Structures are given as C-alpha cells and as structure tokens.
Amino acid sequence: MKEKVEYNIHKFSNSVDSYILEQIYFLNQENTPEVGSLSSIKDLQNLIRLSSINYYVISQDKIIGFIICFREHSTYDSENYKFFSKEERNFLYVDRIAISHKYRRFGIGKNLYLKIESIAIDNNLPICCEVNTDPLNKISIKFHKDFGFSEIGNQKFHDHSVAYFKK
C-alpha cells in the first residue's frame, strides 16, 4: 500500500518565480513523449504567456506536477489546439499535464483535472485534450475515459499520432 503524499496545488501565470518555472520545464522534459518536448525554458514561458489557466503541484518544496490549459481564441500554434478551435466555439483545452513518476497513482492528476473541471462547469465549457496513440499512452487514455471523456477524432502526424478527447 502506498503512503499518503502531502501536496498543495497553486495557480500560476507567466510571472511565476524562475525557480518554479525551471522545475516545471524539467518535469515537462522528464515526461516526454507523453507530453510534447520544449526546446527551452523560454519556450515554456511563451507557452504560459499564451495560456489561460495553469496549476502546479508542490510537495516538500519540489514541483511534482503541473497542468497548462488554453481557452478559445488563443494564438497558440499547436495543430491539436487548432483541431478544437475548428470543432468548438468555446472550450477549455488541456495542452499538457505532467506528474513526476514517483508521485503517480496518488490522485494528483485527478485533483488537477477536478480543478479544471470546476472552471469548465462554471463557464459551461467542454474540456478538450489529445492523448498519444503512437507512441501509445494506454494509461492516459484509460484515465481520460474513466474521467468521462469521449474520443471524438484522431490525427496522424509525421512522427506520432493522437486521439482527440472531449468531456
């Protein structure tokens, strides 16, 4: 049986402390290919600047998770974001979520999604995201289906494939 993990979830924006930003960047890179790789901390800053709603998870002064989300009408140049922009008038798009491997299976991802879901409900928005199907991310697909998401499409790219989900 796993021990309980004490953690706190905090909202953040582009003005986040550089130490926290650095930890988020390294956690992102540790979680590729489940999340897209970023070439630099500056790329992460630009991503956050374009985003709408973001949270990080901290335990014992260490960032152990994060989620970055966008609303409609962003200038974000992601093909996956553009898919939902064409499909939905208003939406909340989860661009990336990452949990440190050591802290998975403690409900942290679910709690981040519950925060996002609360915002979506308050604003009458669907939550949209994509999950890799090549390379296959079975755990994330199961997580999203268990959380009530339905697959609404898929896309093949030159180096990977994704399934699109909506709740």
Each model region followed by its residue ranges:
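Conserved GNAT acetyl-CoA-binding A-motif
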Residues: A120-T133
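Conserved beta-hairpin
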Residues: S52-R71
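Conserved active-site alpha-helix within GNAT-family acetyltransferase domains
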Residues: T133-G153
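A short, internal acetyl-CoA/4′-phosphopantetheine-binding micro-motif in the GNAT/acyltransferase core
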Residues: D95-R104, T133-D134
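Conserved acyl-donor/pantetheine-binding loop and adjacent beta-alpha core of acyl/acetyltransferases
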Residues: I68-R96
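Short amphipathic alpha-helix that is part of the acyltransferase structural core
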Residues: K2-K42, K62-I64
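Conserved acetyl-CoA-binding loop-helix of GNAT-fold acetyltransferases
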Residues: I99, R105-S118
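C-terminal "cap" of GNAT-fold acetyltransferases
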Residues: K4-Y7, N154-K167
